[in-house]
């Protein structure tokens, strides 16, 4: 998806005097943005057509009248920019602001009939009064003294407006956000059976029973009113709404028309099952998706004094509604969606700019998101919040060094705050100084801080570090400064795994990521390999007291994940491995048959490789010794699990030959990794910015010109799946499709060459 750099369009303010001359012109934007803007075109037009209208040269201010202002807020903001003390009148050249003139543009210097002038509501939102205002607002301003009337209106202003807007627009220019939009139209109407609507519809006077209702364009039903939006025209009679009762009597007197065939409507549903039918949404709701090239924390928090922008919905953190109550806004990490009957892409992008600008300052928009998954491991599972216990650190935007002590370049420990709380312990009050949360800065520059006063000491997850070498913070009740992983992550000291084995053995099924930890074998393998070996453990604690040549599961280093059959096959070949997974043994016949190879035994747990080892421990000694699985146990495995022998007698039929355990087709050797042939296709979901969507767009003309089917959705999924398989790609979300395009171009050119050879 191609992103386009997007900015706020410049605005202009014209201040008029009593002679209708413009005594002050203020452009609101950066200088570099104004030259090719809509408002500069307006300025040049006035300059060329009324050369004497401007009495002074224009000024340039990096400011903005936010279009979510109400009229009274806009007057207050503009009045403050101009530095006026008197109330003002807000009007414009091509649209109406403070006052509305029917079939015309309100001009306070030329009012011919005051009866035709109506004031707009002070609570009206700017973008709702004038829909194209996003392109560049032109604000004309004057006062009562200049026009000799009392049309000026009061205003609302707070310095908070200026502070917020100034910081947000500076952030927008600084970050140079790039966007891309897509539009989806909803269905024109939907039909619902709803018992509650029966009373409203059947309460129409003298209208005893609703048989059925059918609708075409230009109609809607609300309560017991039927409205036709266009004036009646007999030429379009067949398009109108028709309602009948049993006697073909119509007792609705407003906009009701007629029909010749009652069955046209009664056949839709069985009349005995009809309770009521409610037709919704005459005009389709439009959903606009605006994608951007940064990361947004979708859980926005709108400050209480920033109430001139959008409203939150209290219950859901990422769903908002605009100030008119007509636009639903849903935020996500990579895009924002807007759903309304009447919204333009320009307005959606305008909202997006301000949401990103606001969030970057107040909601910590980061260039990278907080890590959720590392090598198929979820840190949140090892560092869990529970009710009031907040162990997961939060992301912060800046570091308050007045509350922290710098320990290293990437770590700050919190100071104790002795001014706060007392805590009861029995009947005695105990002084309890609180500690500000520790702060850690990771390699991506993300700043993590412990947010709980009783879990304010930061440490690092041992399992995550052992498996991946990544320092992932978690909050603890006690300091971790003596922990070896802590010293590695904070001070850069070399981490050395403890050679001493942990005597606690866990049940099979849990991931073993630390090289010093142990796990039991699966039940059947344990019976096979350990039936003649001895182990004694303490009940309830699973602590090993004694072990003699006992086979267990241990972590494998380097930590390895197996995602598909190819990776499993390669691992087996490279490591001379016998690999267990889901009660199945996987290996290669050469590993089984070659007596000079000593295979290693592995098992997959949650797609991660673990190894089998033998352990020994004396009862009067705490040390546990580890050794490889002995040959006797390996032979037990070989004998227990059957392996297909080579086919010695040659078989040949229809061009296919099997000899010496190998398959030939027309004399050519087939190189296969397994005797089982299978093709695995991943499910695709044709989403915006996905490879599957890009493929459909690439072949759109071909499909439109050549494919005819009743189910395009099914065809598209099959078509895209095959293309992905040919390209050896999986469906994914991308920002850059240059590699995919090259593959498709090469594929298309190969097809053209092949076809030309065929026809020649």
UniProtKB/Swiss-Prot annotation:
GO molecular function, one term: DNA binding
Claim: Nucleotide-binding is one of the keywords in the record: no
Keyword DNA-binding in annotation: yes
Compartments it resides in: Virion
One Gene Ontology term from the biological process aspect of the record: positive regulation of DNA-templated transcription
Gene: VETFL
Record's signal peptide: none
Official protein name in the record: Early transcription factor 82 kDa subunit
Domain of life: Viruses
Record-stated family: Belongs to the poxviridae VETF large subunit family.
Location (main, coarse): virion
Gene Ontology terms: cellular component: virion component
Subunit organization: Heterodimer of a 70 kDa and a 82 kDa subunit. Part of the early transcription complex composed of ETF, RAP94, and the DNA-directed RNA polymerase.
Disulfide cross-links: none
InterPro entries with a match to the protein in the record: Poxvirus_early-TF_lsu
Pfam families: Pox_VERT_large
Keywords: Activator, DNA-binding, Transcription, Transcription regulation, Virion
The protein's role, per its UniProt record: Acts with RNA polymerase to initiate transcription from early gene promoters. Is recruited by the RPO-associated protein of 94 kDa (RAP94) to form the early transcription complex, which also contains the core RNA polymerase. ETF heterodimer binds to early gene promoters.
């Amino acid at each position: 998806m191609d992103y386009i750099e997007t900015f706020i369009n410049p605005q202009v303010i014209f201040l008029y005097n009593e002679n209708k001359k413009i005594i002050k012109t203020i452009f609101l934007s950066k200088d570099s943005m104004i030259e090719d803007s809509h408002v500069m075109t307006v300025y040049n037009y006035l300059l060329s057509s009324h050369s004497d209208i401007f009495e002074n040269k224009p000024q340039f201010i990096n400011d903005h009248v936010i279009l979510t202002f109400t009229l009274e807020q806009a007057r207050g903001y503009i009045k403050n920019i101009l530095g006026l003390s008197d109330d003002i009148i807000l009007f414009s050249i091509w649209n109406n602001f403070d006052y509305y003139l029917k079939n015309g543009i309100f001009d306070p210097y030329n009012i011919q009939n005051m009866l035709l002038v109506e004031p707009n509501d002070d609570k009206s939102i700017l973008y709702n009064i004038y829909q194209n205002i996003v392109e560049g607002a032109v604000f004309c301003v004057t006062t009562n003294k200049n026009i000799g009337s009392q049309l000026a209106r009061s205003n609302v202003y707070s310095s908070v407006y200026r502070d917020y807007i100034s910081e947000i627009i500076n952030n927008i220019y600084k970050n140079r956000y790039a966007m891309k939009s897509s539009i989806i139209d909803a269905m024109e109407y939907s039909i619902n059976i709803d018992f509650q609507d029966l009373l409203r519809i059947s309460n129409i006077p003298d209208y005893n029973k609703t048989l059925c209702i059918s609708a075409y364009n230009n109609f809607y039903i609300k309560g017991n009113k039927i409205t036709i939006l266009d004036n009646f025209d007999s030429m379009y009679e067949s398009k109108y709404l028709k309602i009948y009762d049993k006697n073909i009597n119509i007792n609705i007197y407003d906009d009701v028309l007629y029909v010749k065939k009652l069955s046209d409507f009664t056949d839709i549903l069985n009349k005995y099952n009809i309770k009521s039918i409610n037709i919704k949404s005459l005009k389709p709701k439009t959903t606009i998706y605006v994608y951007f090239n940064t990361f947004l924390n979708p859980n926005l928090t709108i400050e209480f004094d920033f109430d001139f922008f959008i409203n939150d919905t209290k219950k859901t953190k990422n769903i908002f509604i605009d100030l008119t109550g007509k636009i639903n806004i849903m935020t996500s990490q990579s895009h924002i969606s807007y759903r309304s009957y009447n919204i333009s892409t320009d307005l959606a992008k305008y909202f997006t700019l301000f949401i990103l600008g606001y969030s970057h300052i107040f909601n910590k928009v980061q260039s990278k998101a907080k890590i959720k998954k590392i090598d198929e491991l979820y840190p949140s599972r090892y560092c869990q919040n529970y009710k009031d216990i907040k162990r997961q650190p939060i992301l912060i935007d800046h570091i308050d060094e007045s509350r922290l002590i710098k320990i290293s370049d990437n770590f700050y420990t919190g100071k104790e705050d002795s001014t706060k709380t007392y805590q009861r312990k029995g009947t005695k009050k105990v002084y309890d100084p609180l500690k500000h949360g520790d702060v850690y800065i990771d390699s991506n520059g993300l700043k993590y801080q412990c947010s709980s006063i009783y879990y304010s000491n930061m440490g690092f997850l041992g399992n995550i570090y052992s498996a991946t070498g990544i320092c992932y913070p978690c909050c603890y009740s006690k300091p971790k400064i003596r922990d070896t992983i802590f010293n590695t992550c904070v001070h850069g000291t070399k981490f050395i795994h403890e050679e001493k084995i942990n005597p606690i053995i866990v049940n099979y099924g849990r991931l073993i990521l630390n090289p010093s930890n142990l796990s039991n074998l699966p039940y059947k393998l344990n019976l096979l390999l350990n039936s003649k070996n001895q182990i004694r453990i303490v009940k309830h604690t699973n602590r090993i007291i004694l072990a003699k040549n006992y086979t267990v599961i241990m972590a494998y280093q380097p930590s390895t994940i197996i995602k598909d059959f190819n990776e499993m096959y390669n691992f087996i070949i490279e490591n001379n491995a016998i690999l267990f997974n889901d009660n199945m043994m996987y290996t290669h016949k050469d590993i089984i048959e070659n007596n000079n190879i000593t295979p290693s035994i592995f098992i997959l747990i949650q797609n991660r490789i673990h190894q089998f080892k033998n352990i020994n421990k004396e009862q009067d000694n705490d040390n546990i010794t580890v050794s490889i699985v002995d040959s006797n146990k390996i032979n037990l495995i070989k004998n227990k699990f059957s392996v297909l022998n080579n086919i010695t007698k040659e078989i040949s039929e229809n061009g296919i030959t099997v000899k010496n355990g190998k398959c030939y087709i027309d004399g050519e050797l087939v190189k296969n990794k397994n005797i089982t042939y299978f093709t695995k296709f991943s499910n695709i979901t044709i989403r915006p910015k996905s490879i599957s969507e890009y493929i459909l767009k690439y072949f759109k003309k071909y499909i439109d010109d050549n494919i005819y089917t009743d189910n395009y959705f099914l065809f598209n999924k099959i078509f895209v799946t095959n293309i992905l398989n040919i390209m050896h790609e999986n469906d994914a979300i991308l920002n850059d499709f240059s590699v995919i395009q090259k593959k498709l171009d090469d594929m298309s050119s190969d097809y053209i060459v092949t076809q030309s050879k065929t026809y020649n």
